[in-house]
Amino acid sequence: MFQAQGVKLVRMDDVARELSVSKKTLYELFADKEELLLEVVKVISMGFHQNIKEIICSSANVLEQIFMLYKRVIKHCREVNPLFFIELMRYPQVQTFFEQVHVQHADRIKEWLQMGVKQGLLRDDVNYEVFLRQDGFQIDKLLINPEVRKYPAKVIYDSVVLVMLRGLATDKGLEIIKQWK
């Protein structure tokens, strides 16, 4: 419900009705809307992590993993109301959770980038620690930027992810990128 309609429009009454439980029961399980949202976001995050594991197991190299994940993110962005992401940031517990997840993702991405170097697909002369710290890499923030939000998610990701990957890729990596484009 929240992903389809945004956070503001969905009331606890709506959630109770959708789940076929009383509002009292819902409030026994969740103290308030923020606590419910935090649990919703945790479930979404667990599904995303499971998807990442499947991608890693089914791909031949790190660039393939990145592109498969990229496709998954684009699909998710098309299915979710952009207001969902924007409105979530008004809830401190959810924001804290996202900050923790962002640190975990940065660690995972660093591992992927190092693996790409070992596979000869990414340049070895880049300080990936510095690269990951730059605000430009925080792609998730692009989706809540009102100036950027007017563009479809695929355009945003193509304009940012592909450009970054091309800059990081070796000649061998560029050949793989061309195949996925």
Positions of the model-derived regions?
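Residue-level detection of the helix-turn-helix DNA-binding "recognition helix"
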Residues: R17, A31-D32, K42
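Short hydrophobic/aromatic patch on the recognition helix
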Residues: S20-F30
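Hydrophobic alpha-helical connector segments
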Residues: E39, Q50-E79, L132-D135
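C-terminal peripheral helix-coil segments that are non-catalytic and often amphipathic
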Residues: E111-Q119, Y151-K181
